[in-house]
Amino acid sequence: MSKKPVRVAVTGAAGQIGYALLFRIASGEMLGKDQPVILQLLEIPDEKAQKALKGVMMELEDCAFPLLAGMEAHSDPMTAFKDTDYALLVGARPRGPGMERADLLAANAQIFTAQGKALNAVASRNVKVLVVGNPANTNAYIAMKSAPDLPAKNFTAMLRLDHNRAASQIAAKTGGKVGEIEKLTVWGNHSPTMYADYRFATIGGKSVKDAINDQVWNADVFLPTVGKRGAAIIEARGLSSAASAANAAIDHMRDWALGSNGKWVTMGVPSKGEYGIPEGIVFGFPVITENGEYKIVEGLEIDAFSQERINKTLAELQGEQDGVKHLL
């Protein structure tokens, strides 16, 4: 018997990441090859953006995806999020020239407060929310705080791009296969302060830490490369990472919805005090997902170097949150 379609809302749907994302969702890559989807696509009310969205929808039609059960264009989150089962919040205010970080936080606080309130009012009570738009952790925190009637645990931020970037660097360094890496994680904020941690990781069943055995490379090459990869891509491409961000969003949602088969993945999730992270902060943790739920991997030893890195990314996140508290 065929499954009932689920509703997937995507914001910033006509943007670069949206364009790299929608066709993969419609083809079944995110929720499975047997799960029909209805796409509820949100763009800003601007005429140009809405016209671009219509063009994307024409292309989606022209793909004749068997799993695409319907699609809708919206300019208001109150209609775009109606009964939605999954919400990918991709659209955010990018940092413009001469813009201070505080201005960026304030502009995004406005967007994500409105979207959180709309989700709270009209979305499915079990909606799974992934925030992709930066600053992702803080935007997820804002949306979560604006949706008091929804479970806080259902608001997540994307750290999977950092996770995937770290995995690629490790595979290149060790000569191993990226698909054979397990127990890698990224702690903290989706920003250059993130801490990609391979102390527990294996590649082809062998310890990554032992294979690399180079703390100088870890601190001076690996972590800066992963942390500043987004900036390096903008420098090279003239545009920010879109296809790789969309790919990470698919990975994050697929594992959350369908399970990670016992493997560690990284998600930005609200802390309940694990590893000394204050409750409610949306922080990157190692998680295992099963039956639509994620569980933080607990009991890992945090050495002095790791604690220092975790403290640094936590301090940045607390600074961001303090910067938006008065707006919530």
From Swiss-Prot:
SUPFAM superfamilies xrefs: LDH C-terminal domain-like, NAD(P)-binding Rossmann-fold domains
Chain positions recorded as NAD(+) binding sites: 12-18, 108, 115, 132-134
Record keyword Ribosomal protein present: no
Enzyme class: oxidoreductase
Entries under InterPro entries matching the protein: L-lactate/malate_DH, Lactate/malate_DH_C, Lactate/malate_DH_N, Lactate_DH/Glyco_Ohase_4_C, Malate_DH_type2, NAD(P)-bd_dom_sf
NCBIfam families (UniProt xref): MalateDH-SF1, PRK05442.1
Cross-referenced PANTHER family: MALATE DEHYDROGENASE (PTHR23382)
The family this protein is said to belong to: Belongs to the LDH/MDH superfamily. MDH type 2 family.
Protein name: Malate dehydrogenase
Taxonomic placement: Bacteria, Pseudomonadati, Pseudomonadota, Betaproteobacteria, Burkholderiales
